[in-house]
Amino acid sequence: MAATLSRLDISVDGVSVTYNNARLALYNATCTVEPGTITALVGPNGSGKSTLFKSIMGFLQPSQGRVRIGGFSVQKAQKQQLMAYVPQADEVDWNFPVSVFDVVMMGRYGYMNVLRIPSAKDRRLVMESLERVGMVKYRDRQIGELSGGQKKRAFLARALAQEGKVILLDEPFTGVDVKTEKGMIDLLMELRDEGHTILISTHDLASISTFCDHTILLNRTILAQGKTEETFTKENLELTFGGLPMLSLNQMFESTEVDA
């Protein structure tokens, strides 16, 4: 059955993940990403953010618990191309001999037959996606020749070409200049207004309150979640980050107030 919902939520229910070395990466994580919103996933390095992302995308099988996308299992959501993923830079082989156009076309693979011959619609959507992220002039460039911000925009274009209603972005602002970050944030807000559900993992705490509707705080388990103005507090951040000095948190909040 094809998904008929125009807006899809992400439901994570009691998810735990244990790696082969018996290390517990995620414990009893329960949270909801509301449909048609931008939600920030925040936590220190090693807190399980990427593990949670990979569990939602179906790249990892939880040892317990389940994930649902708009009420669908992850497997059904994958088959229906409901989800798109923008990975961290270190997950990509930048030496692989593919062009930007080829990378964005990969977002259409789920709609093609085994021969992977692009249709006119596939090519049109790829070009429209490149246009939307401002990367048309780089379409023939080898992916490894791009700057950090251009690489992120290329993979965001791939997510757009895939036409997934749910978009996950893992640290999309790392290695990106301020202008590129603002452009990406503006586009994410447009996508939200169009009905996309967006989950974004980020270390850029200062910008979260400017564009994220909700925030989830994670450190091996979910510590707090809710509307950003209610959840993104110094007290909750101290709980999440542990030893992060109060001075750093004060500076971050002062920076946010000035930028706003």
From Swiss-Prot:
User: What does the function comment of this entry state?
Assistant: Part of an ATP-driven transport system for manganese.
Supply the gene name.
mntA
Q: Which organism is it from?
A: Synechocystis sp. (strain ATCC 27184 / PCC 6803 / Kazusa)
| Gene Ontology terms: cellular component | ATP-binding cassette (ABC) transporter complex
Quote the record's binding site residues for ATP: G43, P44, N45, G46, S47, G48, K49, S50
**Location of the ABC transporter domain:** 10-245
Citing just one GO molecular function, the answer is: ATPase-coupled transmembrane transporter activity
Please state the span of the N-terminal signal peptide per the UniProt entry: none
Q: Which InterPro entries does the record associate with it?
A: AAA+_ATPase, ABC_transporter-like_ATP-bd, ABC_transporter-like_CS, Metal_Ion_Import_ABC, P-loop_NTPase
Tell me what this protein is called: Manganese transport system ATP-binding protein MntA
